[in-house]
Amino acid sequence: MSDQQLDPQALQQEENTLIALRKEKLAAGRAKGQAFPNDFRRDSYCNDLQKQYVDKTKEELAEAAIPVKVAGRIMLNRGSFMVIQDMTGRIQVYVNRKTLAEETLAEVKTWDLGDIIAAEGTLARSGKGDLYVEMTTVRLLTKSLRPLPDKHHGLTDTEQRYRQRYVDLIVNEDVRETFRVRSQVIAHIRSFLMKRDFLEVETPMLQTIPGGAAAKPFETHHNALDMEMFLRIAPELYLKRLVVGGFEKVFEINRNFRNEGVSTRHNPEFTMLEFYQAYADYEDNMDLTEELFRELAQLVLGTTDVPYGDKVFHFGEPFVRLSVFDSILKYNPDLTAADLQDVDKARAIAKKAGAKVLGFEGLGKLQVMIFEELVEHKLKQPHFITQYPFEVSPLARRNDENPSVTDRFELFIGGREIANAYSELNDAEDQAERFQAQVADKDAGDDEAMHYDADFVRALEYGMPPTAGEGIGIDRLVMLLTDSPSIRDVILFPHMRPQA
């Protein structure tokens, strides 16, 4: 009977039997005083050895007799040799019955896949050309009590992979590589900005007033202060306070929290880069963003052509720049400018498109609803969508030529928003009026409308220089660069419902 034909109860019973056997082996080790030693220090990593000695022949290695100390998890056990895995990769270790003590050979026979061992010996090469360690000593460091997934079928259940990411990382090299890339991306972003004189800062995660984005926050209670607080939805207002204070180039890479839906593109807890630079505008940020994205693609992929699913996104070409208004007309030739400029017609179009129209929305809000329903998913190649209506941009500076829109863009790639940026509103009186309008929208039923932040208005009253700011979703960016279909694939421990 195949594994697929076994019912879950039988599989669980088999696993329980294996766990019991492993616990017996651990008990025997404890009795000998040999359980979980912590006095071994390796001097080499598996993949480093593979790279360093790739050109050495069997004869050259035999003559050199290079001593090494390695450690790792047993991933394959063929009796005469084992394959161990560490954080860099894998290497074979040879069980030499001529050089290992009888007691050691007896212990090796009791070891299981998943056990973590330490090996000392010399490097050698097999007749097939594989590099290996000819062991002179080897011992068990950690007994694995749970069996690894079957090597033929692996860990294929998606939900189990997310719930037990530790197992996923052990058995799936491509998953480990995804998170190495994520680390690379964040490190390069940090370096990219610091080379341009940006200062990295940290701002509050717990806030008394959630601001900086249109989103529903998580609420909590501060017992000592006896007050309601919120997990931040964005760091924006604190970062702009720092610009007021004289830190003219700042950035933060950290978590945001939004009490909203979960999907392949959304996780309630996510990582965001936000940066602000004085004496710049949103067009400067477009140029900076293009440069950053090209560097990241080149770093990760070695090319500016980014494959994703059945598409290839071209980061090496200038990103398309198109206004919200013009993009609606471009991708919906049946609509006219007159349709979008009439509030009743725009409301009807938004409703027909499937938008949740509450009835109090102004023309600008309706235009954005139409854009989100009819255009957003069509923006496959990189697009900077600009000139968002001021009604939906309460923190952005109005456009000098058309005050009904703002100097703002959102970057879309693959039909997904990747970044949001604008020339910052630094007119304290205008900001106060927009906060008041947001409060009115919230009172009318808009859960995502912003609160009034009097302290932020006060900060602006001291004077903030002309500034441009931007937020980039790290998770979605990593999805693009690793060709990952779900945001859960690029978050180590995504949120899941508790198991029954």
From Swiss-Prot:
Cellular compartments annotated: Cytoplasm
EC numbers for this chain: 6.1.1.6
A Gene Ontology cellular-component term: cytosol
Q: What InterPro entries does the record point to?
A: Aa-tRNA-synt_II, aa-tRNA-synth_II, aa-tRNA-synth_II/BPL/LPL, Lys-tRNA-ligase_II, Lys-tRNA-ligase_II_N, Lys-tRNA-synth_II_C, NA-bd_OB-fold, NA-bd_OB_tRNA
Record keywords, A-Z = Aminoacyl-tRNA synthetase, ATP-binding, Cytoplasm, Ligase, Magnesium, Metal-binding, Nucleotide-binding, Protein biosynthesis
Q: How is the cofactor bound?
A: Binds 3 Mg(2+) ions per subunit.
Q: What is this protein called?
A: Lysine--tRNA ligase
Report which gene this protein is encoded by: lysS
